[in-house]
């Protein structure tokens, strides 16, 4: 595999300063013509860099298509906490390093293109915090692959020209209980994450519940 593989370039680009995520579902009365026209309009209004597009399993099925490995989320049977499913038929990741207001208007324009067949069910505003830390202050994305390894990790290959270069996305909204987290002492906070906040070093004897051991894919 070479680095010339086709990918939506925003997938491998650095995390932008500002972002907006839109989840959309099919309208119950949307017919095939409306869906087709909406998707054609979407393709003409997105570039894969400033706007990244994902298709949900239900939409792919509605289009009488098949993507091996694509499926809707279902909570693990052994889950000990509530893990609700929030499926979407379309997922849009709008990216900008300049103006969050421009993202608002771009999102409105895309929603208007899609309105005959899709409705926005969730919209999330995002930003890059302190050059790549999550809101608890720990570095985010430490183990993300880079260079050719990133391409090899992100891109589908050997599935034919229609699928090669595509990617899978698993979207997980998290709520930070910051007041509760801040109430712990520094050592406890580091053990919860599995890394030391001051130097980002992984803790060898971190407990099995540590974040670093549960979020690797």
Predicted regions and their residues:
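Long, histidine/aromatic-enriched segments associated with O2/redox biology
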Residues: 1-217
């Amino acid at each position: 595999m070479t680095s010339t593989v086709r990918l939506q370039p925003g997938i491998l680009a650095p995390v932008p300063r500002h972002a907006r995520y839109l989840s959309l579902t099919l309208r119950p009365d949307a017919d095939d013509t409306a869906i087709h026209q909406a998707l054609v309009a979407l393709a003409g209004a997105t570039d894969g860099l400033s706007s990244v597009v994902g298709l949900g399993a239900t939409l792919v099925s509605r289009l009488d298509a098949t993507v091996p490995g694509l499926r809707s989320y279902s909570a693990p049977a052994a889950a000990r906490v509530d893990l609700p499913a929030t499926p979407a038929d379309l997922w849009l990741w709008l990216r900008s390093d300049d103006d969050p207001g421009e993202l608002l208007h771009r999102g409105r324009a895309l929603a208007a293109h899609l309105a005959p067949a899709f409705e926005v069910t969730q919209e999330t505003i995002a930003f890059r915090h302190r050059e790549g830390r999550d809101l608890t202050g720990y570095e985010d994305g430490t183990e993300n692959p880079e260079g050719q390894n990133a391409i090899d990790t992100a891109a589908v290959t050997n599935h034919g020209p229609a699928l090669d270069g595509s990617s899978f996305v698993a979207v997980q909204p998290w709520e930070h209980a910051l007041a509760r987290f801040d109430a712990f002492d520094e050592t406890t906070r580091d053990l919860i994450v599995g890394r030391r906040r001051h130097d980002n070093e992984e803790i060898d004897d971190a407990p099995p519940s540590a974040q670093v051991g549960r979020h690797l894919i």
